[in-house]
Amino acid sequence: TIAVTFAIVSLATAGVLLAGCGSKEKKTEVTVFAAKSLNGVMDELCEKYNSEHPNVTFQTNYDSSGTLMTQIKEGAKCNIFFSAGVSQMDELQAGFDGGDIVEGSRRDLLNNQVCLVTWKGSDTKVTDFSNLSLAKNMALADQTVPVGQYTRKALINAGMAGSEYTEVDQLTDDVISKALGGLEINNCANVGAVASAVAEGANEVGTVYYSDTFGYEDQLDIIEQLPNSLTGDVIYPVAAVESDNTSDEELEASEDFLTYLQSEEAVKLFEKYHFTVQ
């Protein structure tokens, strides 16, 4: 009798434990593809959101917006795309094989500004963007990278690229070098690589976003913040991405995180990193 009673109690206890396991909330992983210039602030935002929503975890991928866009179009798993350029988001929103931007999820969330920088203590003769040719060399993001595109647009609008060049994609490194009196160009894969190259003294000057100077205060000097009349508006759009493999839970978590990115807490963090919220 004792053995039978023990068996019944044991089974009952096991049932309670199994029921408890079954009721535990399932974790949902959200994959975020974000421009390299968002690395610091997005790490903080994901961590804060996770502390309030422990059932949601994040997988982050930071690179140039052009590279990220290509990866998404080639089928890489992505739930949220946060671009440093409008054109990359526009291209995805036009449609791509196997996925789409979730209708109504896009927000043109942030503004930034392009800065011409040099390393702390350099003896550069460059005093503003117009006399960039006085530098010996320059770190410049590739044509596929938004900050590289904004810089090339500024060269065109300032009349520094030559009258025959009117489109950003015409300004190869060789064309820019020739237009600026033989300035040596170090082509960089993303804006983070530009900031590092200048901060380390490998290049005399470079163009980065104002937000990229955060954390580099002891290593970089800002020569000039380029006006929007030269670069155009530097807008960061963000949107949810879906494919045939996107679960309802991922979609729901992604849309809630997008709402969080517009919260007062998120706005304060963006501003801490020198972004302006639209």
Name each model feature, range by range.
Residues 62-70, 77-93:
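Ligand-binding clamshell of periplasmic/extracellular solute-binding protein-like
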Residues 76-77, 202:
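Residue-level detector of structured alpha->beta connecting loops
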Residues 21-51, 57, 66, 85-86, ...:
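Exported/periplasmic ABC-transporter solute-binding proteins
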